[in-house]
């Protein structure tokens, strides 16, 4: 038994310059852990509450001093003396202190930072890496990275309504090789954008945010050369993959998308592509069935292996239809649909509404609940994709978590911005530590699909 001796929280800044919570934990025998809470821009309605101060005179209302105070004055006194190695008890005490379904009293940002810092302090005291502390001898699988190289939607001021276009090096033989392929493809994409005199500025997650002015003529919807911005982005990725010297497809690099469709879904139950409308001055909206057909068309025409939030979080019936249509050949990932909540994941499993769950720690708010979400997902034969948020820090916990539970996939941004690269560098360290025991599944990570 190793008792928690001290807990201290403070307000720090994330990758967007927005306040977040950092927590440090010390144990009686010298263990130390530090964790920082991430923050999302595109959020699901059922996510645990990210507690903000609301004082417009300070950080435009986004300060987190309330959450910090809750940790230091309410949570810390109750956890002092508790065994740091007993994660379930630590998390249960905090859940009981909060007493609400979505952690609206104390704030998930503070609770999560404490939960992760305690786990890190326990690993530190045992003098083992976090992934080994959580996963034991079975923790050896390096995840296939899902790298966001073109940003749209809420993550960038670009011409694209869909939020993320990602590359997945499924044909690589190791994680380090996969990362090299990804870096080279990212640089090839930058070169292509420069050649078209497009923008090479990056969005929140380090991907490019192009305007595609070279691809259309003004005031004409059909001027995207008969293609939508999503198709133009996909064409660019295929070209960049080839330019980098790799094959688009199962033997090389495949493509993943996060549509973040809840952001497009309005009260008329249609998906409105506002960025297309802004460019063309013409309305473009799709019904659920039309959206499914559109996504099916993209899958037929491009080497796409994963689609996240292809429909709105309230469109459960649509998700079931989408999964029936293309779920045998494409990973259908629920993010806003499930919000890493076992209650909603179970509902999704029963409805066959997806075949994969995105795992975002701050959506649920404790390590124990996150592990429950991963376990439930994997037992159903679905994949679990561990994910960052658009607002990040140098914290690398999710890298260890992905390896600890052999999730096989991780989504943590592009090949730029140190807050994203930190996670990849941590995975390189883990691969080096595991040495010959390290496993990289590549395409086999998609065990939920028919090969």
UniProtKB/Swiss-Prot annotation:
(2R)-2-phosphoglycerate binds at residues 163, 360, 389-390, 411. Pathway: Carbohydrate degradation; glycolysis; pyruvate from D-glyceraldehyde 3-phosphate: step 4/5. The active site is at residues 205, 360. Binds a second Mg(2+) ion via substrate during catalysis. Its EC number is 4.2.1.11. Its cofactor is Mg(2+). Catalyzes the reversible conversion of 2-phosphoglycerate (2-PG) into phosphoenolpyruvate (PEP). It is essential for the degradation of carbohydrates via glycolysis. This is Enolase.
């Amino acid at each position: 038994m190793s008792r928690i001796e001290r807990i201290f929280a403070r307000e720090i800044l994330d990758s967007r310059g927005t306040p977040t919570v950092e927590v440090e934990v010390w144990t009686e025998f010298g263990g130390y852990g530090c964790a920082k809470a991430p923050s999302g821009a595109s959020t699901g309605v059922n996510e645990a509450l990210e507690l903000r101060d609301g004082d417009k005179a300070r950080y435009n209302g986004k300060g987190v001093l309330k959450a910090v105070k809750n940790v230091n004055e309410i949570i810390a006194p109750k956890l002092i003396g508790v065994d740091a190695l007993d994660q379930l008890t630590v998390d249960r005490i905090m859940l009981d202190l909060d007493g609400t379904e979505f952690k609206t009293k104390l704030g998930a940002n503070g609770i999560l930072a404490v939960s992760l810092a305690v786990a890190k302090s326990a690993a530190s005291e045992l003098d083992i890496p976090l992934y080994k502390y959580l996963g034991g001898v079975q923790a050896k699988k390096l995840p296939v990275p899902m790298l966001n190289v073109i940003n749209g939607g809420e993550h960038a001021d670009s011409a694209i309504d869909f939020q993320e276009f990602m590359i997945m090096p499924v044909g690589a033989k190791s994680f380090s090789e996969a990362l090299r392929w990804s870096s080279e493809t990212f640089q090839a994409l930058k070169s292509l954008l420069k050649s078209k005199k497009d923008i090479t500025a990056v969005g929140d997650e380090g991907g490019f945010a192009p305007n595609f002015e070279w691809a259309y003529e003004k005031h004409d919807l059909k001027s995207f050369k008969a293609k939508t911005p999503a198709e133009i982005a996909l064409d660019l990725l295929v070209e960049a993959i080839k330019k980098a010297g790799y094959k688009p497809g199962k033997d090389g690099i495949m493509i993943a998308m996060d549509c973040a469709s809840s952001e497009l879904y309005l009260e008329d139950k249609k998906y409105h592509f506002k960025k297309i409308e802004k460019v063309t001055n013409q309305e473009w909206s799709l019904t659920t069935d039309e959206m499914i057909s559109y996504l099916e068309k993209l899958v037929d025409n491009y080497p796409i292996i994963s689609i996240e939030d292809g429909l709105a979080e309230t469109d459960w019936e649509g998700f079931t239809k989408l999964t029936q249509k293309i779920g045998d050949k494409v990973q259908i990932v629920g993010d806003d649909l499930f919000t890493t909540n076992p209650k909603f994941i179970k509902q999704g499993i029963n409805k066959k509404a997806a075949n994969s769950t995105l795992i975002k720690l701050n959506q649920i708010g404790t390590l124990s609940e996150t592990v429950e979400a991963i376990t439930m997902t994997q037992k159903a034969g679905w994949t679990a994709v561990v994910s960052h948020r658009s607002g990040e820090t140098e914290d690398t916990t999710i890298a260890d978590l992905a390896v600890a539970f052999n999730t096989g996939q991780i989504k943590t941004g592009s090949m730029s911005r140190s807050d994203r690269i930190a996670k990849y560098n941590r995975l390189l360290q883990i691969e080096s530590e595991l040495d010959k025991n390290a496993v990289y599944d590549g395409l086999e990570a998609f065990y939920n699909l028919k090969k």
